[in-house]
Amino acid sequence: MDIYRLPALSDNYIFLLHDPNQNIGAVVDPAEVRPVIDKLESLGAELVTIFNTHHHFDHVGANKQLIQKFPQLKVYGGVEDRGRIPGQQVFLQEGDRVHFADRVGEVLFVPGHTIGHIAYYFPSVAFGETGELFCGDTLFAGGCGRLFEGTPAQMVDSLNKLRNLPDNTRIWCAHEYTLKNLQFAITVDKDNTDLQSRWAEVKTARGRNEATVPSMIGVEKRTNPFLRWEQPALQLAVQSQDPVQTFARLRGRKDRF
């Protein structure tokens, strides 16, 4: 399974999964139609699947146009998003399986950003290979999504679920937010040397207009404050030892940053 990162809108990423053996594609969170069509045409591939993580327009905006062009498309989304994802036919819950190419993905229910948010996790199939996580707006490189519909407790549970995936899991998050996320992270975890190194690397990469997605679970566990709510430095920064309250105060600071 090949994965292509397609920039869209101002800072979105669409992900096109390609099965070179059957020359078919699946798209994750198509915000715009043109980048998807252009990549499919360059591959000569047929689109067969849409995997949506949640209902926000910058993740489902191209659903209708893609269905018009590929009438046999199957559209997947979370069961809690029934009626909110255009063209949705398959309603997924925690633990359901999805199939593409030679990979079997697991559905993870990760409410917080929205109440119906799901993620798609494709475990590695061979020693030394990476797992692949398509997590929408739940976990970002260096950050996490705003809480538009869910609660801090829900988001902590969701992020903990993602944090427990293998360290060599690649994180295909849906926005290029890393620079600003790490700019905030430094303010609450300034003595973290791993974070300092990553901040320098990301500044250089973005200065060259290079993408910082995908990230890795192992990297996020060392540098992302929203996966480090038990760390004394972060608890001290927000004056709380309670995990949910620590997260909520960090998220509140980030919202105002």
Swiss-Prot record:
Xref: CDD domains: hydroxyacylglutathione_hydrolase_MBL-fold
Superkingdom of origin: Bacteria
Catalytic activity from the UniProt record: an S-(2-hydroxyacyl)glutathione + H2O = a 2-hydroxy carboxylate + glutathione + H(+)
Binding site for Zn(2+) 2: 58-59, 137, 175
Single GO MF descriptor: hydroxyacylglutathione hydrolase activity
Root EC class: hydrolase
Pfam families: HAGH_C, Lactamase_B
Binding annotation for Zn(2+) 1: 54, 56, 113, 137
Family to which the UniProt record says this protein belongs: Belongs to the metallo-beta-lactamase superfamily. Glyoxalase II family.
Subunit structure: Monomer.
Protein name: Hydroxyacylglutathione hydrolase
Species: Trichodesmium erythraeum (strain IMS101)
UniProt lineage: Bacteria, Bacillati, Cyanobacteriota, Cyanophyceae, Oscillatoriophycideae
Gene name of the encoded protein: gloB
